[in-house]
């Protein structure tokens, strides 16, 4: 299982939100490229970037920062989400050196777009499913749909999606532990690999994910915990490697 540091971008800075609320953000660095360097030097093997402005505006806003990080680390798998709602945007990021694009809102509102994106950019597409009480949220979490996460995930199995990033909104940024039972249930219900996100606080939460014994869980995204020092990236990755080894 990969430990994947998150860099959330708002107005060019690296921030963390609580429960997806733009008005409840903490700025951790005004230099996201240097922040990426910190996690790379700490031994991370993949980075998770989110264009928060893009998620709300429906198109990339912090694209220059994403490109700068991708160019600095050409051999590091990088995934980007937030405002990806056209093939042109995906093409832009892929050409910039980004390994995976995360389709969120567009995947919920226009599932056929996911299949189209997978055909155009095979192996590059991840679907981001953000949920509250099992229902999918969209538009930067501002809207809660009537769509069940597991039902939607199954729809994407035939499309060639590389992974699903599952985020529990109620947990995100709160550092109260991630929703292990639902994450494991999602991984068991779909053939698509799952990346857990939201609420990871410390090594105990990583252990809980591993102890779920769900082979479909391939990664865990962590944000506030690594910024506030309750989780060490290198230590957590070493723990995962030893557990799997």
From Swiss-Prot:
One of its GO terms (biological process) is L-tryptophan biosynthetic process. Keywords: Amino-acid biosynthesis, Cytoplasm, Histidine biosynthesis, Isomerase. It catalyses: 1-(5-phospho-beta-D-ribosyl)-5-[(5-phospho-beta-D-ribosylamino)methylideneamino]imidazole-4-carboxamide = 5-[(5-phospho-1-deoxy-D-ribulos-1-ylimino)methylamino]-1-(5-phospho-beta-D-ribosyl)imidazole-4-carboxamide. The keyword Metal-binding does not apply. InterPro entries: Aldolase_TIM, His_biosynth, HisA_bact_arch, Isoase_HisA-like, Isoase_HisA-like_bact, RibuloseP-bd_barrel. It is an enzyme of class 5 (isomerase). It is found in: Cytoplasm. GO terms for molecular function: 1-(5-phosphoribosyl)-5-[(5-phosphoribosylamino)methylideneamino]imidazole-4-carboxamide isomerase activity. Its EC number is 5.3.1.16. Pathway: Amino-acid biosynthesis; L-histidine biosynthesis; L-histidine from 5-phospho-alpha-D-ribose 1-diphosphate: step 4/9. One of its GO terms (cellular component) is cytoplasm. The active site is at residues 8, 130. It comes from the Bacteria. Its main location: cytoplasm. The keyword Amino-acid biosynthesis applies. Belongs to the HisA/HisF family. This is 1-(5-phosphoribosyl)-5-[(5-phosphoribosylamino)methylideneamino] imidazole-4-carboxamide isomerase. It comes from Pseudomonas fluorescens (strain SBW25). The lineage of its organism: Bacteria, Pseudomonadati, Pseudomonadota, Gammaproteobacteria, Pseudomonadales. The gene is hisA.
């Amino acid at each position: 299982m990969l430990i994947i540091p998150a860099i959330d971008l708002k107005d060019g800075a690296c921030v963390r939100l609580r429960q997806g609320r733009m008005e409840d953000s903490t700025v951790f660095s005004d230099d996201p490229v240097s922040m990426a360097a910190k996690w790379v030097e700490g031994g991370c093997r993949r980075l998770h970037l989110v264009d928060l402005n893009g998620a709300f505006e429906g198109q990339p806003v912090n694209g220059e920062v994403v490109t700068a990080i991708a160019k600095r680390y050409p051999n590091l798998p990088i995934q980007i989400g937030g405002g990806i709602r056209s093939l042109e945007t995906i093409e832009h990021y892929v050409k910039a050196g980004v390994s995976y694009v995360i389709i969120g809102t567009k995947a919920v509102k226009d599932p056929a777009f996911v299949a189209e994106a997978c055909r155009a950019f095979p192996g590059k597409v991840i679907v981001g499913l953000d949920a509250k009480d099992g229902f999918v949220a969209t538009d930067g979490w501002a809207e809660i749909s009537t769509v069940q996460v597991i039902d939607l995930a199954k729809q994407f199995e035939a499309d060639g999606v590389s992974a699903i990033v599952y985020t529990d909104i109620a947990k995100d940024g709160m550092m109260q532990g991630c929703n292990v039972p639902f994450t494991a249930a999602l991984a068991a219900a779909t053939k698509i690999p799952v990346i857990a996100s939201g609420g990871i606080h410390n090594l105990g939460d990583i252990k809980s994910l591993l102890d779920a014994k769900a082979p479909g869980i391939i990664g865990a995204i962590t944000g506030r915990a690594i910024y506030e020092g309750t989780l060490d990236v290198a230590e957590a990755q070493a723990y995962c490697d030893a557990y799997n080894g």
